[in-house]
Amino acid sequence: MKLNKMFLVGALLSLGFASCSKEGNGPAPDSSSTADTHMSVSMSLPQHNRAGDNDYNPIGEYGGVDKINDLTVYVVGDGKIDVRKLSTADLQVNQGASTTSIVTAPFQVKSGEKTVYAIVNITPKVEAALNAATNAADLKVAYEAAYAAFSDAGSEIATLVNNQDQMIMSGKPVVQTILPNVSAANASVQNKVPIIVKRAAIRASMTITQQPVNGAYEIKALRPGNVEVVIATVSDLKWSVAQYEKKYYLQQKDNALSPAASFVPASTNDYNGANGAMKHYDYSQLANRITVHQLNAPYSVTDVPNVAYKYVSETTHADNDYRKGNTTYILVKGKLKPVAAMWADGEQAAYQEGGDLFLGLVTGKFYANEANANAANPASGGAGNPRVVTYKAAAVYYYAWLNPNTLDPTTWTMSPARRNNIYNVNISKFRNIGLSGNPFVPTDPDPNNPDTPDNPDTPDPEDPDTPNPEEPLPVQKTYMVVDVTVTPWTLHNYDIEF
C-alpha cells in the first residue's frame, strides 16, 4: 500500500496573564502587613509546540476559539501556599486569530523565591486535590498526578460550550525570585512570571475530498499496469474515535508519556481481560458517530472551524512500544454496495438493500444467500468453516491512526497523540473493500464485568484481514487514501494512500 496524503495540525494558543489581588480557596494569601511587593503572571500557549511535538511537516496554525472561565494561581514560598482563583469578572480576555490573552492587575505578595503554578479552567476534581495540599511537596505531587480525563461528570478535561472549547490548561510551574519593593505599576516589568501552558485535550476530526458519484464513493482497486477498476461503492460514511487514555497527567511529562505508556500488549490475551486495554483506554465514543465532512478542496486551516470533532486525551508510548492495541484510532463505518461484476451469478438480483452481504474468499464474489456462499466457498481441505466473510447489514469498516510518523504505512512505527493538537484524517480515495467489523475493542471472559466496552461492530472471525492488537503499526494491505491533519491549534502535511 502506498502512503499518499496525511495532514497533521499541532494546536497551540497564546495567553498573557497578570493576576489581581483576590483570595481563592485553600490557604489565605499573604496579607498586606507581610506583603512587600507586587508581581504579575504572564500565561501563554506557545505559537509552536516544543521539539518533538512540532514534527511531521508543519504547514500552518490555528488560533482556536477557547472559552475561558477562570484562572487559578498557586504561589508557593516561605512555607505558604497562596491560592488565587480569578473568574472572568477579574480577567480581561482578548481572543485573536492566532492568540488569546488574559490579563489581570498585579497583586501583592511577599518577596523572595516563589514557585508559581497556573491552571486555566480548573476542574472540581483537580481543584479539590490541589487545595488539599498543605505544603509545597504535597502540592507538587498533586500537580504531577494523573486524573480521570472524561469519566468524572463535571470534571471532564474538555467540553464544547456554545461552539467554544472549554478545556483545562496547565504547564510547568515556574521558580522565580520576586523582587522586593516593586510597585503595581512596575510589576509587569520587574516581577513578571512567565508560564507556558497547553490545552490538556486533543481534537480529532475526519473529512473526505474524494467526490461522490450518485451519493456514494467509488472503491477503485488497482489492477496490473496501475489500471483502476471500480469494484464497489461505499456510502453513509460516519466516524468515531477510540482507544485513548482514560487518565491524563495534569502536568505533561517532559517526555510527553501518558499514564498508561507502559501498557504494551504482547498477545490478544494481554489486550483482553480486566487488566488489559479496557483498564487503560476509553471506547465510549464508538457508538456516537459523526458524519464524515465533505470537502471540495484539500483540508486546510480555514476548514477547522467548520468540521465537527471529538475530544480525546493524550495517548503516547516510548518510540518502540506502539501497537495496534494501544494506539488511538479513528473508525469509519460505511454502507457497502458491490458493482455487478463482483456478484456471483444470480445473487445481485436476489439481494435486498440493507441485508447481509457474503463475500466468498475462494470465488472472490459476493452473495445475497449465505447457503449459496458457503457451498461455493468450502473450507480449505474440506474441514472447518466455509471461507466466507459476512458484512452484517452491508456495513464496512476502515480505521486510521491519528498521527503516524512516516509517509509510508509499511514503515510506521509510532503514532503519538499529543495534547494541544488537532488531528484531522482526510479520506482522499478508497482502494479496497474494508473490514467486516472493528477489531480493536477489548473483551473479557467474564460476562458480568460492567467495564467491558460495548462493541456493536464485532468483525467476522473468518475475515482474513482482521489485524491483531499485539501487532506493530505497519500494515501491508490498506483500504483508503487518508490525509491526516494535525492542527497549533501548527499544521502538518502528510501524503498517505490506504
Curated annotation (Swiss-Prot):
Pfam families: Fimbrillin_C (PF15495). InterPro entries: Mfa1_C, Mfa1_fim. A lipid is attached at C20 (S-diacylglycerol cysteine). Gene3D superfamilies: 2.60.40.2580, 2.60.40.3690. Residues 20-50 form a propeptide. Residues 436-476 are annotated as: Disordered. It is found in: Fimbrium; Cell outer membrane. The keyword Transmembrane helix does not apply. Residues 1-19 form the signal peptide. The keyword Membrane applies. It comes from the Bacteria. A lipid is attached at C20 (N-palmitoyl cysteine). GO terms for biological process: cell-cell adhesion. Keywords: Cell outer membrane, Fimbrium, Lipoprotein, Membrane, Palmitate, Signal, Virulence. One of its GO terms (cellular component) is outer membrane. The record marks R50, A51 as: Cleavage. Structural subunit of the minor fimbriae. These filamentous pili are attached to the cell surface; they mediate biofilm formation, adhesion onto host cells and onto other bacteria that are part of the oral microbiome. They play an important role in invasion of periodontal tissues and are recognized as major virulence factors. Mfa1 orthologs from different strains have highly divergent sequences, and this correlates with pathogenicity. Belongs to the bacteroidetes fimbrillin superfamily. FimA/Mfa1 family. Structural component of the fimbrial stalk. Minor fimbriae are composed of a structural subunit, such as the 53 kDa fimbrillin, and the accessory subunits Mfa3, Mfa4 and Mfa5. Fimbrium assembly occurs by linear, head-to-tail oligomerization of fimbrial subunits. This is mediated via insertion of a C-terminal beta-strand from one subunit into a groove in the N-terminal domain of the following subunit. This is Minor fimbrium subunit Mfa1. It comes from Porphyromonas gingivalis (Bacteroides gingivalis). The gene is mfa1.
